[in-house]
Amino acid sequence: DDWDDAYANARHAMGNLLPTVTGGFSSTLEAFGFDLSVSASFQLGGKVMDEGYQDLMHVKSRDVGKNWHKDIARAWTPQNQHTDVPRLDAGDSNADATSTRWLVSSDYLSLNNVTLGYTLPRHLVRHAKLASARLYAAADNLALFAARQGIDPRQSQTAVYANSYTAVRTVSFGVKLTF
């Protein structure tokens, strides 16, 4: 029971999965036949366990042959004592144990869509027996700005991020003809 009591008393809340604020914004500008539409979303507050990064920072002997994250090059050595990356020790099974070291902010700003279009003047489209013609280019999931490069905090509903695929970036072009 002493162990259970010590363990229970040693645990502390280190953050919250739930964000403080979520939101989005969009805007459309039109001038001289051109139109530009932008939409974005954001989240402030909340934490996520970056297990993808944790897995790439492994040092255990059973992990031979696995890739490492580039940050492993900053590991502690007698010549590199000013670092936040522990020394490499294949015999230390706790080197990448779950801890607050892997807890990162789930704040993000996502540029969801940008669309740029041009509507041809009526005097040009009338000759083709059209009511209107619009050319456009659109990009979805254009950019994500987050606390750690490579993590997509939009993917986690369980406070754990472990190598999930992020939203696909797409670029499309189109023509809208109205008869």
Please identify what each model-predicted range represents.
Residues E30, S41-Q43, A138-L142, T178:
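Outer-membrane beta-barrel pore domains and translocons
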Residues V38, L135-A137, V175:
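Membrane-embedded beta-strand positions of outer-membrane beta-barrel proteins
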Residues D1-L17, M57, H69:
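Conserved small-residue
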Residues G24-S26, N113-G117, S172-G174:
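Membrane-embedded beta-strand positions in outer-membrane beta-barrel channels/transporters
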Residues N67, I72-P78, L142-F179:
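C-terminal beta-signal and terminal closure region of outer-membrane beta-barrel proteins
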Residues G33-V38, H123-L124:
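Repeated loop/turn-to-beta-strand initiation elements of outer-membrane beta-barrel proteins
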Residues V21, F32-F34, D107, K129-A133, ...:
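Outer-envelope beta-barrel architecture signal
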Residues Q43-R134:
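Extracytoplasmic gating/loop element in the C-terminal half of outer-membrane beta-barrel translocons
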